[in-house]
Amino acid sequence: MRANPLFTVLLAAACGLFPAVLRALDKNDIEFARPNDRPLLLDLHVPDGAGPFPAAILVHGGGFDAGTRKMYIVPTFEVLSNAGFAWFSIDYRLAPEGNFPENVHDVESAIRWVRAHAGEYRINKSKIALIGESAGAYLVDYVGTHQTPETKVAAVVSFYGPANMLAQAEMHRDHPEMFDQAAIRRHPNGGLKAFGVKDLDEAGASRLRQISPINAVHKGEPPFLLIHGNKDEQVPYSQSPAFCEAIKNAGAQCDLITIEGGHHGMGNWKEPNQQHWKTDMVAWLKKTMKVK
């Protein structure tokens, strides 16, 4: 009597002889931290397969007082998904509720959470990148230049971030409450106050230098990729070449991608000659994190 091939396959699968097929996973509204009883949530995507996958933690912008995990950073979702990366898009406390360094601590909490749940979500803990844009870029720049064993990442991708906060403030010396972006002035505790600075005087300038990632670069930090439009009207393009040069001078790795004619925000990069950041970013991440 000849065996039925289909029956044989089904029996083998039932007996665990064939590995189960692990499907892609998309989950929303996952709590990753609760500072002062305030739940912080993330959305995630995990690709098809057993993994372990490289992953990215995504940090949105919005002038430190606006934005969510579902805004501004969204163009990276499809890019990373199509490249076989898992990703985790996070919220963090916004001014005036969450000033510096509370927002930094929230990003660090997200790193610890992803590392702690790496097995559950099929993540390679040694291949986690931080990706941030605008205000979120400042946060990933800061975390990347101040990493600890618990918050260590393999790479940082920073889109048009203000790495030199004093230079950013000097742009608006006559209106220091607007030193980052116009949005933050909506709150009485926003602007310079959100960073522990009362006035743009000598003490204030010293404080801004102290919290600027450009002044914290060191040889042991993770590799950085900076992506910036050279027509940015909110965070000057000059911020990124200066930051990248400082990183390289410190003995660490940095690469810069310039978006010709690009204004502030990846969502504004709609021209065909501005789309290369997608393939360039993926290629850089794979090379830097040794992803096959």
Role assignments for model-derived ranges:
Residues 22-292:
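Alpha/beta-hydrolase superfamily serine-hydrolase fold, recognizing
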Residues 1-6:
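Positively charged n-region of N-terminal signal peptides that target proteins for export
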Residues 8-19:
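Bacterial N-terminal signal peptides
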